[in-house]
Amino acid sequence: MASVHQVDIKTDAQTHYHKAMTEIYVVLEGVGEMELDGERIAVRPMSSVMIKPGCRHRAIGKLKILNIAIPKFDPADEWFD
């Protein structure tokens, strides 16, 4: 089972990771970057990024994204350093 939700990122997100969840971010609006394990990747509308379990990540910039979480999003599986 998966979940899909829209997220409005207004400020740079805090670096975090998930132990069990894979996420796919699809950028709907805005221009910014995704930071994956310290590597920055430029994103713009219709860019997509797959984030595997254990990957420390964050979004940088003002973005509207579609977040696809597999399995479905569980706030208990959100870990911060």
Language-model features: locations:
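Glycine- and acidic-residue-biased ligand/ion/polar-headgroup-sensing regions
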Residues: 20-32, 37
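A cytosolic small-molecule/anion-sensing beta-strand core signal
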Residues: 5, 28-29, 44-45, 61
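Short acidic-glycine-tyrosine-enriched beta hairpin
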Residues: 38-54
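Well-ordered beta-strand positions in beta-sheet-rich domains
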Residues: 24, 40-42, 56, 62
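Active-site donor-binding loop signature of nucleotide-sugar glycosyltransferases
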Residues: 9-11, 45, 53, 70
